[in-house]
């Protein structure tokens, strides 16, 4: 992606992103990540999907933000990606203006933009064919409300987000997307097993204990056909297309560290950076980085071409997004591992950015869709 493609507010947004980058660098020292999210609310960065109409520009701006912040903190950037993919998928899905979902969406976006809201997501299945198998969160209609109960193992931005957006099974069949305030006694957060490694993401388990959600905050989905729900697949595709950005940002930071190492390291009276062997290894890292990034940009273009009701385009964008996730996260991890071999013990020195990234980069391939799900899908779709 060319950095000049920044939409209608290039100067402001580029300045905001640089400021956010510098702020996050400072926060990394104290690890008071709540302060960073408070700062982020004062910018337009979290609300890009509410402020742009062009789908590809929305994608590019969200990706660039996540990529830049990922150079400093994978956990923080991953958490923001959870906010982005839900917001972007809802904001850009081509609802017909005659549908009630269109107007519910407009009200929701205006609320998010006006109140500077952060949203978190949980409970959505992120594979193509398994929409009906998500039984973790259930909802039952009761007059003008739905009563929601169940549990999801992971949710980022727990305690930071103002609202939760999640998908649940309906007791009478089908699925629906729910929008609920997070400050509610019927929502309980508990710590996950990640410990301090993903501290900045505020990832916790979430339990719904008969949470009452008004029907006005619910978008029902048509999941009765074999194709399942377009909106869920579209939402899933946004997630896959964006989730590599934090990891590729971190990989780029590591490549910069390798270049700096080559300039400083002396071998037989010459800089390491002058050796053909070093340049060959460095070139391989950059090839992997740029190749993965190009796949991500292709996923963004596929999202922009989607038309409601077009199964071929839906499948194409889903596959483009999954491929970008698979190769993006794997290439990022490979870059970091190869950099460790090049830099040796200096790479793992305590309190260095390379050591921090080395501990965080492994989470990329583990995020949905996992390798086993991706390979299972493509084994049936040659």
Predicted regions and their residues:
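Alpha-helical scaffold segments that form or flank carboxylate-/histidine-based iron centers
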Residues: 238-240, 273-285, 316-327, 355-363
């Amino acid at each position: 992606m060319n950095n000049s493609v920044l939409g209608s507010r290039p100067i402001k947004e580029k300045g905001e992103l640089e400021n956010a980058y510098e702020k996050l660098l400072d926060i990394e020292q104290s690890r008071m990540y709540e302060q960073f999210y408070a700062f982020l609310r004062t910018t337009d960065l979290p609300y890009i999907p509410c402020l742009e109409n062009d789908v590809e520009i929305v994608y590019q701006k969200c990706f660039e933000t996540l990529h830049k912040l990922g150079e400093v903190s994978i956990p923080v950037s991953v958490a923001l990606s959870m906010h982005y993919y839900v917001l972007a998928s809802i904001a850009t899905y081509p609802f017909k203006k005659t549908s009630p979902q269109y107007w519910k969406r407009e009200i929701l976006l205006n609320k998010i933009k006006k109140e500077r809201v952060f949203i978190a997501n949980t409970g959505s299945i992120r594979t193509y064919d398994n929409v009906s198998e998500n039984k973790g969160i259930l909802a039952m209609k009761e007059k003008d409300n739905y009563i929601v109960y169940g549990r999801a193992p992971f949710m980022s931005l727990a305690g930071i987000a103002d609202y939760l957006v999640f998908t649940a099974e309906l007791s009478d069949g089908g699925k629906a997307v729910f929008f609920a305030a997070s400050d509610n006694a019927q929502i309980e957060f508990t710590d996950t097993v990640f410990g301090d490694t993903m501290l900045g993401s505020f990832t916790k388990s979430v339990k719904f204990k008969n949470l009452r959600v008004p029907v006005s905050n619910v978008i029902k989905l048509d999941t009765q056909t074999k194709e399942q729900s377009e909106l869920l697949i579209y939402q899933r595709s946004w997630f896959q297309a964006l989730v590599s950005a934090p990891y590729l940002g971190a990989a780029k930071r590591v490549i910069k560290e390798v270049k700096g190492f080559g300039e400083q390291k002396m071998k037989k009276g010459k800089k390491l950076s002058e050796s053909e062997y070093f340049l060959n290894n460095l070139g391989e890292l950059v090839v992997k980085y740029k190749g993965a990034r190009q796949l991500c940009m292709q996923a963004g273009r596929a999202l922009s071409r989607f038309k409601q009701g077009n199964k071929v385009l839906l499948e194409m964008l889903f596959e483009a997004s999954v491929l970008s996730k698979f190769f993006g996260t794997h290439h990022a991890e490979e870059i970091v591992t190869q950099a460790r071999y090049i830099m040796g013990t200096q790479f793992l020195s305590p309190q260095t950015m390379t050591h921090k990234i080395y501990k965080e980069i492994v989470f990329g391939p583990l995020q949905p869709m996992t390798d086993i799900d991706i390979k299972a899908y493509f084994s049936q779709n040659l």
